[in-house]
């Protein structure tokens, strides 16, 4: 059976200070360094995490380098045993973000008003409510990337929606390179290293 919740242990500010990455005032200590994030995923399909990911997950060297695994939490509806296995066998260097817009696949800009195609009112509160239960269960606070596609980019209401369940950040496409929306970091999806 699934656990009630799968909390994540994030690196603390103190640990980052001890490693020399943060100054005492909480600002980043660059010291001429560049930083890179290893984002593993686009695991938005049960076939990916049940058939492909095990080859990566079972690699003996996993855990030597911090990795951000991006898995759609709604996959718990299709392959809960796989989701459970990854979380209970994660190393301290395995972190998790939600893949592809959150707990499901859509273009969230289409939920913002005005909704010219449907004429409906904003669907952002329904999206936040839907995502929140999955984020809380799986200990998620980051949305790995937000696919805008043909939809408008997120406006202030759209950013507020994501901040309500993804407070540690989102990575949309149609945004400035970096932005801080209230306290939520926003980094534009840009180039991939394949």
Model-derived features: positions:
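Sequence-level detector for tyrosine residue identity
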Residues: 6, 21, 39, 43, ...
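Metal-dependent polysaccharide deacetylase catalytic core of the NodB/CE4 family, i.e.
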Residues: 71-153
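Non-catalytic propeptide/linker segments at domain boundaries
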Residues: 1-62
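Short charge-dense sequence patches
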Residues: 30-35, 66-77
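Aromatic- and glycine-enriched glycan-recognition loops and surfaces
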Residues: 44-55, 63-65, 74-87
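Structural preference for beta-strand elements that scaffold enzyme active sites
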Residues: 35-37, 66-68, 95-97, 141-144, ...
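Active-site-adjacent pocket scaffolds in enzyme catalytic domains
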Residues: 1-16, 126-130, 134-194
